[in-house]
């Protein structure tokens, strides 16, 4: 087998090696079935057990009580931009959003397309989305407040969530779910495309509080209602079985190998601090996010434009992949998701030092 690289892609992203190895072992014969997990029926006991285990582990890891349901949908976070206002808006009430990057802007646009009254409670667009707003003013009659907990393009992250009182929080946690401890109680709904911290592309986690399900209008199309999936345990139609199986293995790894979310957060802080400490110690590379808003998941930085292509090319040749920034902003981005090892971050820092020595 070719040597595995250190994968800093923003998503689809690195998966834990023990998970990949377990998938490899089970690929041709899943639990004595004589079939691959790719072949078993979603109505079989084999897949039922996979689904049940994934739900139990997610609830245990995030400390979700019985008022929350865990659903597995398709369509990515982009479909949730549409489904959230469609399902959770209330007649005569505005829906509130905090705008912190391109993805939250897209969520706002989807709500407006539906004719919802959208209130932008705060925005960091005045400084190119390089920070998380400190003041969030939510109208007291808002149906919900939507935030993007981590912003992959600009490399910013909420380090404490806004206090909204009785107004439910809704969050896109696609890029930092399972990465740190947080209190789920203020959240009416959390959604996350799996392909960064939870599994492969193809499945979207939706964690919804049961009182929010009472808002879902009956006249919505069947496949666009959260209640369709809550009532059928995510199996109204054929679910993305292999992706859910992978999520189950990732959550098993988080529990049994890492030791839970608190331990995962400790590891993520060490990784982030290692790279940020180096960025702050020199002036060739320049971090783009304001220090108090820096993301532990996506570290964004720039270097002289003339050197960018050379940096990315040489890094790739050195086994450091996926460092090119998002096409909308350029620069570089190192995504340090849960499965990224500390030694990978240390190897990146060593490469950056050597690149400066040769080119600075």
From Swiss-Prot:
It is found in: Cytoplasm. Pfam families: Aminotran_5. It is an enzyme of class 2 (transferase). L-glutamate binds at residue 43. SUPFAM superfamilies: PLP-dependent transferases. GO terms for molecular function: O-phospho-L-serine:2-oxoglutarate aminotransferase activity; pyridoxal phosphate binding. Disulfide bonds: none annotated. Gene3D superfamilies: Aspartate Aminotransferase, domain 1, Type I PLP-dependent aspartate aminotransferase-like (Major domain). Binds 1 pyridoxal phosphate per subunit. Keywords: Amino-acid biosynthesis, Aminotransferase, Cytoplasm, Pyridoxal phosphate, Pyridoxine biosynthesis, Serine biosynthesis, Transferase. Pyridoxal 5'-phosphate binds at residues 77-78, 103, 152, 172, 195, 237-238. Homodimer. Belongs to the class-V pyridoxal-phosphate-dependent aminotransferase family. SerC subfamily. This is Phosphoserine aminotransferase. The gene is serC.
């Amino acid at each position: 087998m070719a040597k595995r690289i250190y994968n800093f892609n923003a998503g689809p992203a690195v998966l834990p090696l023990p998970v990949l190895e377990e998938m490899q072992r089970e690929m041709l014969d899943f639990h004595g079935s004589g079939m691959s997990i790719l072949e078993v029926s979603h109505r079989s006991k084999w897949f039922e057990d996979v689904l049940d285990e994934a739900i139990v582990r997610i609830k245990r890891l995030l400390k979700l009580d019985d008022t929350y349901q865990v659903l597995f949908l398709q369509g990515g976070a982009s479909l949730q931009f549409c489904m959230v206002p469609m399902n959770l808006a209330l007649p005569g009430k505005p829906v509130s959003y905090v705008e912190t990057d391109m993805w939250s802007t897209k969520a706002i646009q989807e709500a407006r397309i539906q004719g919802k009254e959208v209130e932008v409670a705060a925005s960091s667009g005045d400084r190119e989305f390089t920070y998380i707003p400190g003041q969030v003013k939510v109208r007291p009659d808002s149906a919900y407040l939507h935030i993007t907990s981590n912003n992959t393009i600009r490399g910013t992250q909420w380090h404490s969530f806004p206090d909204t009182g009785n107004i439910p929080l809704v969050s896109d946690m696609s890029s930092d779910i399972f990465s740190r401890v947080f209190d789920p109680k203020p959240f009416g709904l959390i959604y996350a495309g799996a392909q960064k911290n939870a599994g492969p592309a193809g499945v979207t986690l939706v964690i919804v509080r049961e009182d929010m399900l009472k808002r879902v209008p009956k006249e919505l199309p069947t496949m666009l209602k959260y209640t369709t999936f809550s009532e059928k345990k995510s199996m109204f139609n054929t679910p993305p079985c292999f992706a859910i199986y992978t999520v189950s293995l990732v959550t098993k790894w988080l529990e049994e190998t890492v030791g839970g979310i608190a331990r995962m957060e400790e590891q993520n802080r060490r990784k982030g601090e290692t790279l940020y400490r180096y960025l702050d110690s020199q002036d060739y590379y320049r971090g783009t996010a304001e220090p108090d808003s820096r993301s532990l998941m996506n570290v964004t930085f720039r270097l002289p434009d003339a050197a960018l292509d050379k940096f990315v090319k040489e890094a790739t040749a050195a086994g450091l992949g996926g460092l090119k920034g998002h096409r909308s902003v350029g620069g570089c981005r190192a995504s340090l998701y849960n499965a990224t090892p500390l030694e990978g971050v240390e190897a990146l820092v060593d490469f950056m030092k050597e690149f400066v020595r040769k080119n600075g």
